Amino acid sequence: MYIYCRFLTNEDLDEFNKLNAVRGIYIHSDMTTYNLDTGSYTCKRLFSSSTSSTLSDTRDEFWLDMPRFHNESYEYFACVKFTTNVLSIDDLGEIFSQKISPKTKSVRFPKREPKNRYLRVIGGDNPQYPIYVVSRGRYDEKCAKTVKELNMMNVPHFVVVEPDEYDLYKNSFDSLGYTYSEVLKLDMSYKDNYDTLDDRGDTVGKGPGGARNFCWDDSIRRGFSHHWVLDDNIEWFRYFTDNFQRKMRTAVCFKASEDFFTRFKNVAMGSLCYTMFLDSKDKAYPFVMNTRMYSIIFIRNDTPYRWRGRYNEDTILSLDCLSNGLCTIQMCAFSADKITTQRVKGGNTDMFYSVEGTDNKSQMLVDVYPQFAQKVFKFNRIHHYVDYSVFNMQLEYRDDFTTDNLDKINDYGMRLVNIPKEWDRTYKDSREYIESHLDECEEVDMFNIPL
């Protein structure tokens, strides 16, 4: 068994050594591995060559009149891989002074205090453009992750479901008090006529693409030039800056993002990044250009393409846009906690992934775009790999947009508060309740949070 342990300061390392002196364990900052059974260890190399890039980056120049974004890399004072074939879980718990399980792979010493767990971003406005959540078989509170979050954030949205599940969704959401959710019946002709890009017909599920095309056209019928379409398995939305991810109880993540995306005449799609892809200790930029859009997607309605493909339809649509000279933007300043593809019952999991795995999914993308995609095996299953480096288009402002007189920072009315821990994940952990009970919360400096 192995566990990586990170120490932020020299004082943390000294505390660890004092705690474990009786065991004969002594760690210094140059160590990289330590065998708890034998006391043997390895150290860092004395010399290393720098691999840091000296190339300039222009993304910050575009980040005007937007929320603060500043993430510089920082190093832990020490990071050591501890190994053992002898010690028990209880022994390890005593050594690291925290709960350890057989699945534990990484800890920080001392254990991080949970106080930041109850920080919430509030304030600001709702988005200008409609939000659609495409859902299937996820109408109860446990599975309707995105819908629950949007209600806790007080964000109006549409939930698109197949007609045979309409009553299940409507009754469930009514009983849960999800007043911000409007359930729409999918026009099944969108599913029947959907281009799956294969010859398997109705023998397996067709995926969410047909419903997403319905959302696209529905937003046009309602008079909108853009729309959002979200997966139904999002647990949190976050604001990332100063090396910390803040949980949001506001829709500023959508409002600020759409304001940014629509500044440019050659941006067809935007999305929010997955939180799990953003390392809080690494240098980061507020957005990434010309890559795949997924799960929390913003689309310009006059884009001359539509969803297609039984699998990997998000990557296919992204490549449709990119290969024809249009840009995409993935936000890093705002992110979403996405439940992994095959962990939640319903949706595509019940359609095919739980039966087929992911091989067919990856193969379809390779068949459609062989010049960009290939299949690889990693993390114990088949994945696809796409080389996005060939897409180097630059952002172009709309002709009627000017940066004159723009401030560098626009906080969009966001505030940060620390809620009582007993409110966490209850009905009180909602924007409406928090903002009406601010006297019971502690206001916190948004940009001065102990890491």
Question: What would you call each of these model-derived segments?
Answer:
Residues 130-157, 161, 165-173:
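Short, well-formed alpha-helical segments that are part of the catalytic scaffolds
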Residues 124-130, 138-141, 309, 315-451:
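C-terminal catalytic/acceptor-binding lobe
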Residues 15-22, 91-98, 145-150, 168-179, ...:
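Short, aromatic/basic amphipathic alpha-helical patches
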Residues 143-146, 209-210, 244-259, 355-360:
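Well-ordered, non-membrane alpha-helical segments in soluble/globular domains
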Residues 163-228, 235-246:
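Active-site-proximal specificity loops/subdomain of glycosyltransferases
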Residues 1-124:
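Compositionally biased, non-globular sequence tracts
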Residues 236-323:
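Conserved catalytic core of nucleotide-sugar-dependent glycosyltransferases
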Residues 6, 79, 128-136:
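Short, hydrophobic/glycine-enriched beta-strand segments
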